[in-house]
Swiss-Prot record:
Pathway: Pyrimidine metabolism; CTP biosynthesis via de novo pathway; CTP from UDP: step 2/2
Gene, per the UniProt record: pyrG
HAMAP family: PyrG
Organism name: Serratia proteamaculans (strain 568)
Protein name (Swiss-Prot/TrEMBL): CTP synthase
EC assignment: 6.3.4.2
Length: 545
């Protein structure tokens, strides 16, 4: 089987939406019956985004096989059925790390190690490895054409056309076509200059995706085609839309998938986008709305919680409810009190690291528990719920996590020192272990407790969910906590680690150590988020009565 490659680049400005555009195109090609995957090449020098600040970089998306990756991989999984893996994302730092390791080992036999050919060869090897077994691979190159950091990646994808054949490679370039109100027209010159920059590197784009706040007129698309040496039918207008789920249909309506299939000589049936049309219908025709408060520490950048926000919206789709998300800084709860939580239909505390704002989260969990407000805790959100319950119900004064207070009297949350990874191998960690690459991360099996709320929501006894954490419930203190009324609703496959807790005497209080947001999609939703949003709607109705 021959694999075809679509290389996606961006020009003029950053944040044009390359990831969404690539994922939307992949969704159409998948709907035509093709085996599709997507890769993201990141030009930064960090080995992976695992230790990068969420406020700078956004969330870290975790794959099934335990890779800590760019948030764009979350977009990919929400648009196509193919599961991403560590092969779908790599950085400049990872490439240089691999090449330097080989140099130290003597693999290059004393040769002078250079960007060309050694770095570019390493990039190409990873692209080819990631593309194995697929009909079409979309490769998104991070950054903007013209950035110094991107040059080795652009050179590598230029060489790919020579090595795998021009008939199996296609260059798709996203560019900005701004509208100038004073002139009353869109301007194509930035696009022309961006393509000129690509040409100077040796890449002639085959498709231009023109981003604008309005549809780019046919005469302007013809002008772009003429000056950029691209067929007119390959100049696609991608205007701003009120829902990102409309983008696959928008691209299909302009024949982009037909053009690509003809270019690659792929005999594929017409795309059926009925599932996406259903998503659009559900989003446009809600039966009501709920307000959910998300209490975290990175709220100044919503992308830090991208998958959680999307998963809440998916939960809304499954319940025909519009979900309004109110982002609340947990430090505001500490300074202003629980007044900032008034008027919410449900409360969610997502994952996080570090002590800042933790006490505000503990106060939030108590407020939700005592006022019968639906509560969903994720990762740290489960740990603070446990701390709160231990303090205020069990009577363990100042119960805490050893992450925050190493010598606390009641360490209800402690460092995991040993567990099994996704392959069944034993992993061991200590307080001295590096921060990068040392967490319990990736898909882990969980056995659900019979007659629990989560068992009812999932509809099956065993699930697999993705983790990213170092600390877990301390089993030494668990019996006392369970005796006070807390239910352990899910445990790890070896029965050693607590994965889910519930409060049976509360209308809807669920907290999990894993990250369910990473497996939620607009077409399928996720049982926990669907149940959580449903509970928010029911709470709202009770308040009205």
């Amino acid at each position: 089987m021959t694999t075809n490659y679509i290389f996606v680049t961006g020009g003029v400005v950053s944040s044009l939406g390359k990831g969404i555009a690539a994922a939307s195109l992949a969704a159409i090609l998948e709907a035509r019956g093709l085996n599709v995957t997507i890769m993201k090449l990141d030009p930064y020098i960090n080995v992976d985004p695992g230790t990068m600040s969420p406020i700078q970089h956004g969330e870290v998306f975790v794959t099934e096989d335990g890779a800590e990756t760019d948030l764009d991989l979350g977009h990919y999984e929400r648009y196509i059925r193919t599961k991403m893996s560590r092969r779908n994302n790599f950085t400049t730092g990872r490439i240089y790390s691999d090449v330097l390791r080989k140099e130290r080992r003597g693999d290059y036999l004393g040769a002078t190690v250079q960007v060309i050919p050694h770095i570019t060869n390493a990039i190409k090897e990873r692209i080819l490895e990631g593309g194995e077994g697929h009909d079409v691979v979309l490769v998104e190159v991070g950054g903007t054409v013209g950035d110094i950091e991107s040059l080795p990646f652009l050179e590598a994808i230029r060489q790919m056309a020579v090595e795998v054949g021009r008939e199996h490679t296609l260059y798709m370039h996203l560019t900005l076509v701004p509208y100038l109100a004073a002139a009353g027209e869109v301007k194509t010159k930035p696009t022309q200059h961006s393509v000129k920059e690509l040409l100077s590197i040796g890449i002639q784009p085959d498709v231009l995706i023109c981003r604008s706040d309005r549809a780019v007129p046919a005469n302007e698309r013809a002008k772009i085609a003429l000056f950029c040496n691209v067929p007119e039918k390959a100049v696609i207008s991608l205007k701003d839309v009120d829902s990102i789920y409309k983008i696959p249909g928008l691209l299909k309506s302009q024949g982009l998938d037909d053009y690509i299939c003809k270019r690659f000589s792929l005999n594929a049936p017409e795309a059926n986008l009925a599932e996406w049309e259903q998503v659009i219908y559900e989003e446009a025709n809600p039966g009501g709305e709920v307000t959910i408060g998300m209490v975290g520490k990175y709220v100044e950048l919503p992308d830090a919680y991208k998958s959680v926000i999307e998963a809440l919206k998916h939960g809304g789709l499954k319940n025909r409810l519009t979900v309004n998300i109110k982002l609340i800084d947990s430090q505001d709860v500490e300074t202003r009190g629980v007044e900032v939580l008034k008027g919410l239909d449900a409360i969610l505390i997502p994952g996080g690291f570090g002590y800042r704002g933790v006490e505000g989260k503990v106060m939030t969990a108590r407020y939700a528990r005592e006022n019968n407000i639906p509560y969903l805790g994720i990762c740290l959100g489960m740990q603070v719920a446990l701390m709160e319950f231990a303090r205020n119900v069990v009577g363990m004064e100042n119960a805490n996590s050893t992450e925050f207070v190493p010598d606390c009297k009641y360490p209800v949350v402690a460092l995991i020192t040993e567990w099994r990874d996704e392959d069944g191998n034993v992993e061991v960690r200590t307080e001295e272990s590096d921060l990068g690459g040392t967490m319990r991360v990736g898909g882990q099996q969980c056995h659900l407790t019979d007659n629990s709320l989560v068992r009812q929501m999932y509809g099956e006894p065993t699930i697999v969910e993705r983790h990213r954490h170092r600390y877990e419930v301390n089993n030494m203190l668990l019996k006392q906590i369970e005796a006070a009324g807390l239910l352990v609703a899910g445990r790890s496959a070896d029965n050693k680690l607590v994965e889910i807790i519930e409060l049976p005497n509360h209308p809807w209080f669920v907290a999990c150590q894993f990250h369910p947001e990473f497996t939620s999609t607009p077409r399928d939703g996720h049982p926990l988020f669907a149940g959580f949003v449903k509970a928010a709607g029911e709470y709202q109705k009770r308040q009205v009565k």
